[in-house]
């Protein structure tokens, strides 16, 4: 049985891993997942990530905690396979009044809502992270 929504699976693994105070979580790797992990690392929501394996690459995310609490308070899938959500540059949402981020897939790659606004790009809203 194939996975219907691998991005939702990735976000769920992060959410469950932090709820269980895990140091790291692993999942099957894909280019989009690596791009999302890169954005999460740049924004300080995860410590690090690495891709291991040749035939079946695995993505390992090292989760981040501050004073024993998970850095990621909430992580929510927005655009999904059954209902894609696209926004123009002027319509990009501000998550928690700018405290969180929206991960956006644009024509120039995956980036935060802030970076997309500065670049004058719209795109598909993948998820909200706060």
From Swiss-Prot:
CC terms in the record's Gene Ontology section: ribonucleoprotein complex; ribosome
Domain of life of the source: Bacteria
Entry's Gene Ontology BP terms: translation
UniProt gene name: rpsH
Species classification: Bacteria, Pseudomonadati, Pseudomonadota, Gammaproteobacteria, Enterobacterales
GO terms of molecular function: rRNA binding; structural constituent of ribosome
Keyword Metal-binding applies: no
Classification via InterPro entries: Ribosomal_uS8, Ribosomal_uS8_CS, Ribosomal_uS8_sf
Matching NCBIfam families: PRK00136.1
Keyword rRNA-binding: yes
Family of this protein: Belongs to the universal ribosomal protein uS8 family.
Keyword set, alphabetical order: Ribonucleoprotein, Ribosomal protein, RNA-binding, rRNA-binding
A matching Pfam family: Ribosomal_S8
Subunit structure, as described in the record: Part of the 30S ribosomal subunit. Contacts proteins S5 and S12.
Official protein name in the record: Small ribosomal subunit protein uS8
Functional summary from the UniProt entry: One of the primary rRNA binding proteins, it binds directly to 16S rRNA central domain where it helps coordinate assembly of the platform of the 30S subunit.
């Amino acid at each position: 049985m194939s996975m219907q929504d691998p991005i939702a699976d990735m976000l769920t693994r992060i959410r469950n891993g932090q709820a269980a105070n895990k140091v790291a979580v692993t999942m099957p790797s894909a280019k989009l997942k690596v791009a999302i992990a890169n954005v999460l690392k740049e924004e300080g929501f995860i410590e690090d990530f690495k891709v291991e394996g040749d035939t079946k690459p695995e993505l390992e995310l090292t989760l981040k905690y501050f004073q024993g609490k998970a850095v990621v308070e909430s992580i929510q899938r927005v655009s999904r396979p059954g209902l894609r959500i696209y926004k123009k540059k002027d319509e990009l949402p501000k998550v928690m009044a700018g405290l969180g981020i929206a991960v956006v897939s644009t024509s120039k790659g995956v980036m935060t809502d802030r970076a997309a606004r500065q670049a004058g790009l719209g795109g598909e809203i993948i998820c909200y992270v706060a």
